[in-house]
């Protein structure tokens, strides 16, 4: 048995659940792949905040706190979504859908991780970072999961704000404040989330429809969805270029090249739908992960090298 995207892959034998399966179930609840992507954005934000001179211990402590916060939020999300996870093929093998972990135990686990993350960040970084993490968990679980997700096709637009917070937490851990580069990084991820998520939802439209989740591809035509994907992709790239005001030439060059590539894929998807051709939205979903990773890795290297900024702002 192995873990993939918060799922348990493999069969749990009948009868009592083995200890190993239970442990894998708890790990799966935290959605490790999602956490991995969130943490990829935290380190570059911290390096940019102090142009590469950040204390490695502070980075480690912030990552631990961020990991605990994301794991807690994801677990509580799984608890709230246990009913619809059973109805979707993409999620039917998650631990709660298969009863590998009791729902009450998962709730306690998620709450414990969330509380621990708050006090960890408070103790090792500062109060602002701790409060940002706590607010993110509350927003993701109470606003996105319990309210927006099942009620509006714009759920991922507003709910995606939670996924933007690691850059704010990372920045505030270093500076104790929130400044404009942190807000621009927030916008990069905020605008990136809809095309990333809607591309996946296009592939699993029937799943969301069966679960009663009004994702945009469920309630709108493919042409409308891909047009929205294109708009948000342009906004994403524009935000990455705006961040170049605070970086050196390396980040700016990578942002231009990667942005051109990301836009080309979004335009290709939109053009294919307009022509009535079969399209592969999952390709855009997967490559959007690579795009975000490349841009933020370039930011990390640019900041670590303390390259001279292109503009004085």
UniProtKB/Swiss-Prot annotation:
UniProt GO cellular component terms: plasma membrane
Family designation: Belongs to the UbiA prenyltransferase family. Protoheme IX farnesyltransferase subfamily.
Enzyme class: transferase
Pfam families: UbiA
Function: Converts heme B (protoheme IX) to heme O by substitution of the vinyl group on carbon 2 of heme B porphyrin ring with a hydroxyethyl farnesyl side group.
Domain of life: Bacteria
Record-level GO BP terms: heme O biosynthetic process
Keyword line: Cell membrane, Heme biosynthesis, Membrane, Transferase, Transmembrane, Transmembrane helix
Keyword Transmembrane: yes
Record-listed E.C. numbers: 2.5.1.141
GO molecular function annotation: protoheme IX farnesyltransferase activity
Location relative to the cell: Cell membrane
Bilayer-crossing regions: 34-54, 56-76, 105-125, 128-148, 152-172, 173-193, 243-263, 291-311
Protein name per the record: Protoheme IX farnesyltransferase
Gene: ctaB
Reactions it catalyzes: heme b + (2E,6E)-farnesyl diphosphate + H2O = Fe(II)-heme o + diphosphate
Pathway given in the UniProt record: Porphyrin-containing compound metabolism; heme O biosynthesis; heme O from protoheme: step 1/1
Record's bilayer topology term: Multi-pass membrane protein
């Amino acid at each position: 048995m192995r873990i993939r995207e918060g799922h348990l892959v493999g069969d749990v034998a009948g009868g009592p659940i083995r200890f190993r399966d239970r442990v894998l179930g708890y790990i799966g609840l935290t959605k490790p792949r999602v956490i991995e992507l969130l943490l990829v954005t935290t380190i570059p934000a911290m390096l940019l905040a102090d142009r590469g001179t950040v204390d490695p211990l502070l980075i480690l402590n912030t990552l631990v706190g961020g990991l605990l916060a994301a794991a807690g939020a994801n677990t509580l999300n799984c608890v709230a979504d246990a009913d619809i996870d059973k109805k979707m093929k993409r999620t039917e093998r998650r631990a709660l859908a298969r009863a590998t972990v009791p729902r009450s135990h998962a709730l306690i686990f998620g709450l414990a991780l969330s509380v621990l993350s708050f006090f960890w960040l408070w103790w090792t970084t500062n109060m602002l970072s701790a409060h940002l993490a706590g607010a993110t968990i509350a927003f993701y679980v109470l606003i996105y999961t319990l309210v927006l997700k099942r009620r509006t096709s714009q759920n991922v637009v507003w709910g995606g704000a939670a996924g933007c917070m690691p850059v704010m937490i990372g920045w505030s851990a270093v500076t104790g404040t929130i400044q404009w580069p942190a807000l621009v990084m927030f916008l990069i991820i905020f605008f990136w989330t809809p095309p990333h998520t809607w591309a996946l939802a296009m592939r699993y439209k029937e799943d969301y429809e069966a679960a009663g989740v009004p994702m945009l591809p469920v309630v709108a035509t493919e042409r409308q969805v891909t047009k929205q994907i294109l708009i948000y992709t342009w906004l994403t790239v524009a935000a990455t270029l705006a961040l170049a005001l605070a970086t050196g030439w390396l980040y700016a060059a990578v942002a231009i090249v990667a942005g051109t590539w990301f836009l080309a894929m979004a335009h290709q998807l939109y053009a294919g739908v307009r022509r009535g051709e079969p399209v592969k939205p999952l390709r855009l979903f997967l490559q959007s992960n690579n795009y975000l990773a490349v841009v933020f890795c370039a930011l990390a290297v640019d900041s670590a090298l303390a390259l001279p900024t292109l503009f004085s702002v």
